[in-house]
Amino acid sequence: MLHSASVIFLSLSVLAAVGVWGPFVRDGGFDAMDAVVARHPSTGIPGLQHYPEFDRGLMSIVAFNLSAVNSIAYCFMMQFLANVAVIPVILCTEDSSAAPGSWVRYSTIWGLLSQLGTSAVIYPLYAMSFIRQSSREPSQTRQPMSDMALILNMAMGYALPAAITLNVLHSSLNMQIWGILAFTVYPICMKLMARIIKVFTGFRKFPTRSRHQSIPTLRYAVAGGVALQGHLWYLGTELGIFKGHTPSLSAEKMDSEGGARLVLRFLQVDYAITFLAMLLLAWHELIYHRILPAWRALGGLIIGWILVGPGATLAAAWYLRSRFIMAPGKRKKRYGD
């Protein structure tokens, strides 16, 4: 029998998906996105619907089944972590046109810092989880995550985004955008960051890559990170996001206002729905392992989303889950025992 909180949360998730994705599909949002991506001058990407294997990879990761993740799932996570960078570009552009002291200015600054910080915090924790959960050691013998690892990760994760968001160098909009785009190569350092964290947490063993894995993670991240820069810049100019800052933009390309709105809506919805699904499963894990009561876990996830962003909240929930499961001798110290 389902818990009442489960019914409420699941119902809200379904309503959000139907209420927002429905109009998007009805208005031809996917067709508009495919039309833009398919016109890429260098790669000629055929469209988003031609890659169904990424959906299967997403399901593996969202289900926290990292020990059984295949190469497609690793590739999808790299792509997902890199592509969240397009929202900060949009926020930065909108912030530059907002009136000083307005609520729009404050909301975009908060959103930009939250988004960049979310990305910076979640990347190395995903790397750590890849290493830990793909280990062949029994879960009871693995060393739990260190509190210092999370503190250091938060400090490193929010320092550079704060400098970019607050524009401490007083640079132009184009320089800020290039700073954000440069920040998106952070996934390339994902495995290197995991090795740095290893020093602070005392990890001694790293799993060896299986011979049947066809796509090395780091090689894919490097290629994907380089390609992402060109794709983001092309999509930005194609959709008129950088209107007024790209003199070479032709009159024909400027006639894409409807497409820009649809793509922006897609990015917003995709970001919210993806993290909502992942936080829903994180909430389930917290109450399934009886780490927190249902309503306390739900309230903490909601407050965390508002204050520090969904990615950092998900990372914290994942940290609690992993620390409880991996910590030896802590199995009986659950609430209610």
From Swiss-Prot:
Q: How does it sit in the membrane?
A: Multi-pass membrane protein
EC number from the UniProt entry:
5.4.99.-
Subcellular localization is given as: Membrane
Residues crossing the lipid bilayer are 5-25, 72-92, 111-131, 149-169, 177-197, 222-242, 267-287, 298-318
Q: What GO cellular component term, any one, is given?
A: membrane
UniProtKB keywords:
Glycoprotein, Isomerase, Membrane, Transmembrane, Transmembrane helix
Q: Output the Gene Ontology terms for molecular function.
A: isomerase activity
Tell me if Glycoprotein is a UniProt keyword of this record. Answer: yes
Pathway(s) where this gene product acts:
Antifungal biosynthesis
Report residues carrying sugar chains: N65
Q: What's the domain of life for this entry?
A: Eukaryota
Q: What does this protein do?
A: Cyclase; part of the gene cluster that mediates the biosynthesis of the tetrahydropyranyl antifungal agent lanomycin that acts as an inhibitor of CYP51 and blocks the ergosterol biosynthesis.
Entry similarity comment: Belongs to the membrane-bound ascI terpene cyclase family.
Its protein name is Terpene cyclase
Q: Which organism is it from?
A: Pyrenophora dematioidea (Helminthosporium dematioideum)
